[in-house]
Amino acid sequence: MNIKKTQFIKCFLFLPIATLLACSIGENSFITPTPIVEPQISVEEILNHSHTVMLDTKTVKFQISHSNGFTEIMDGIFLTNAQGEFVNPDAVSIIFDGEMSNGFYIKSGFKIVQDEVFMLNPFRENEWELLPPNMNPFDEMDPIDSIGEVIENLQNIRSFNYDPNTQQYNVFGDIKTNFVAPIFGLNGLLDQSTNIELKIDSNHFYINQVRLIGPIGNRDPEDIVREIIFSNYNEPLLIEVP
């Protein structure tokens, strides 16, 4: 009798603990991520707001990266990753990692202020050289104006949603290559489009990220992906000549 009584007491004490553990495990097992939801605003309204914001932008910082490819910015110089700053309307600073046609890694950059073009010598640390204006690979680079044109000329919007975790609107569509090629110092493929994804801040309607999936220049592979991340909108920024 004493043994049975002891066993009964143990079982009686164990059951609540086991129940709590089971509930805890069950709750953790069924935790699901916050779903991407339908926005409470139309994609046209979002793009209109974003276009207005971009037109009023004075300064911005950006990062460029590539998957499955690169951008040839000058003969034999291929940009893979870059970070830069832009002051509207005519000052750009960009530092990039890249390769030469022989596979040699280089780190270089450009500073363009009005009509003056300086290139960071890839073989001499911190040495900038003045170039003739016609050697400026980013002569038409204006990320603010280019993104404004992208917003205006977005086509075939296939998907549109809101991610509450990142507080961003996600827009998926197509864009003619001639509207995005100038960001990379390229001439767009004639009468061709590429897939584009936009991530737009839901509070201020800034463009946070642009992904271009597919070729925009005549030397691009079919599976190339370019990504541009924008940040630090309208913060004080001064680009000076070296």
What are these regions (language model features)?
Residues A18-A91, R158-N161, E235-P242:
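N-terminal leader/targeting segments and the immediate start of mature chains
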Residues S65-T71, E99-G103, D115, P122-E125, ...:
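Hydrophobic lipid-interacting interfaces of membrane-associated proteins
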Residues L120-L189:
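Flexible, processing/modification-adjacent segments and terminal tails
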Residues M74-N81, G103-S108, L190-N195, E222-R226:
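Short, surface-exposed coil-to-beta transition loops
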Residues E45-T52, N81-N88, G109-V117, N195-S202, ...:
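Extended lipid/amphipathic-ligand handling interfaces
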Residues M1-L21:
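Sec-dependent bacterial lipoprotein signal peptides
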Residues N81-I144:
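An acidic-aromatic
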Residues Q167-P242:
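Gly/Pro-enriched, hydrophobic low-complexity segments
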